[in-house]
């Protein structure tokens, strides 16, 4: 592999993933148009850095992210990478202008329809395979079943569980930003992994209360996404966003205090954000989205940076992170 990135086992699946997984939402045009060349350069930088796991979804640019990742990986040996996508949204022809829908730009003329039924999931996976130019998906995640938990459990999960039994897919999981509902799924389904977005970070460690212990108890791997809380933990400047909205003054002040402590230790706040998440024994890998090669390079540099042992105890002493997170 091309850097100091480690490969780690994904729970009980037999799969191994790079400790940093490429998150495919930004190259799907999230919040701004991303050109083909820019997206390809981001993927090339990830591969060159040693990233060998890629996470995408039909939702990301209504298929644009899947198509771009599929085109990039088509020339690579299939055994050399792990591919994750999601189910729960079917893509259908859209009658009107779709630019900016759900925050994505430069997208195909398609719309999303929620569908967590068995038949809907099977059809969605077939569509994803075509867009990804592959004959198999390694990890299938039920995507954002916030208001559809029971249907997702009875329909989507049952379908994915059968595909796993038939060895069509290697791992089954759920991906969303509600830690409590993820725990609900962990306690009711035989999951291999969960993808938790934004709920285990320097600013929001709420997943540590219930979800992460539940995953440890059941041998469920945790993939942590949204670890910069949409930007504030990469650069806590005035106007920074927290969970895709302008950061409240109190959170911005806290992030700036975290940055000041990090500076005393010679550590960029982005590096601290990554290392904090990976310190938890339940967390297998981080999912980091990037829209260009420079963002990939920066993320990898932060992940491979040395972080002094005294940083996190000092953050806890200052009341900026929970005491339990440094034990």
Q: What kind of feature is each model-predicted range?
A:
Residues 12, 72-78, 130-133, 185-189:
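Acidic (Asp/Glu)-rich catalytic clusters
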Residues 15-20, 50-52, 77-81, 134-138, ...:
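Short, well-ordered coil/turn segments that N-cap beta-strands
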Residues 10, 22, 54, 69, ...:
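Conserved, mostly hydrophobic/aromatic
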Residues 129-148:
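Active-site groove signature of glycoside hydrolases
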Residues 1-93:
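N-terminal binding-site loop/beta-alpha segment at the start of enzyme catalytic domains
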Residues 93-104, 237-240:
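Short, flexible, mixed-charge acidic loops at enzyme active sites
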Residues 4, 145-327:
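Beta/alpha (TIM)-barrel catalytic core signal, keyed to glycine-rich beta->alpha loops juxtaposed to Asp/Glu
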Residues 33-46, 116-131, 177-184:
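Short, acidic/polar
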